[in-house]
Each structure stands twice: as structure tokens, then as C-alpha cells.
């Protein structure tokens, strides 16, 4: 069984680095920065394929004090429904590209503040909703795999 390593530095030619991004597509920290520097991620593109990577939005910037003359912004997790829809689109994309192998990082579990359980269960919900054969070209982090396997969604 293959798992996505915590510090993925190199990909095979058919490999795609799957990372969590913010809704502005500013890839300035965590796995997003790795995707930008090593795997062709594009600043300004919040979701989807880019270079040898694929972005899934997990966080956004929100106004903290909108009533002030000079509002400040802070980061927040995207709503779960937004993450779920992005996971749906990702799974559909993987099913349309069987020639590629997708290495999913622990998206959203760093800067964005999601727990492993929350993200893995969001993927589980997305996987369970598909009426097509589940793609076998996704490599999961061990922690995600254990939850998906427990729920009977991966072998």
C-alpha cells in the first residue's frame, strides 16, 4: 500500500501534487508554497489542475472588523459545503485522468485548521456520492486512508 509522504519533494512523471489552497489562490505557505515552488502551481488560481499539481480550496480570507474605516482580514476555513464541492470536482477529475496518479497531501490540516477527521470524512462523503467506479489513481495520506478504509470506501 502506498501513502503520500508528509514531505513529498519529488513526483514521478505521471504524479500530481494535491494541496490545499485559499480562495484567492495565493500559494504563500504550507503545501501550497511547495506546489508553487516545485510543482507548477499558479498564483491566482485557487482550484484545479496547474502544472504538476491540483489545488483544493480549504481556507479563505474574511473581514474581521468590517465596520472600521480600515478593516482587517483574517483567515478562516471555507464552509464544509465549499470543501465538499471541491472534493467532488477533484474526484471527478481523477476519474477522467486515469493516466495520472494523484498524491493527496493532508489538505486543510495545517494553516487552514481542519482536523484530519473532518477532511477525510468530507472526502468520504464525496466518494460515497459517486455513481461511477471510484478511481484507483489517488494516493492518500495514511491518516486519510485509515478513515476511508474504515468507512469501506477504499481497499
Where are these predicted regions, by residue range?
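Macrodomain-like recognition of ADP-ribose-binding/processing modules
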Residues: 1-155
Amino acid at each position: 500500500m502506498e501513502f503520500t509522504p508528509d514531505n513529498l519533494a519529488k513526483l514521478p512523471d505521471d504524479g500530481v501534487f494535491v494541496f490545499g489552497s485559499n480562495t484567492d489562490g495565493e500559494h504563500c505557505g504550507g503545501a501550497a508554497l511547495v506546489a508553487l515552488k516545485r510543482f507548477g502551481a499558479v498564483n491566482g488560481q485557487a482550484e484545479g489542475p496547474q502544472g504538476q499539481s491540483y489545488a483544493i480550496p480549504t481556507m479563505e480570507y474574511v473581514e474581521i472588523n468590517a465596520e472600521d474605516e480600515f478593516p482587517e482580514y483574517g483567515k478562516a476555513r471555507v464552509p464544509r459545503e465549499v470543501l465538499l464541492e471541491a472534493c467532488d470536482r477533484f474526484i471527478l477529475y481523477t476519474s477522467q485522468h486515469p493516466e495520472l496518479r494523484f498524491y493527496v497531501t493532508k489538505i486543510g490540516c495545517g494553516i487552514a485548521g481542519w482536523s484530519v477527521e473532518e477532511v477525510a470524512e468530507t472526502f468520504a462523503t464525496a466518494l460515497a456520492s459517486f455513481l461511477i467506479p471510484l478511481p484507483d489513481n489517488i494516493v492518500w495520506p495514511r491518516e486519510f486512508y485509515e478513515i476511508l478504509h474504515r468507512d469501506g470506501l477504499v481497499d
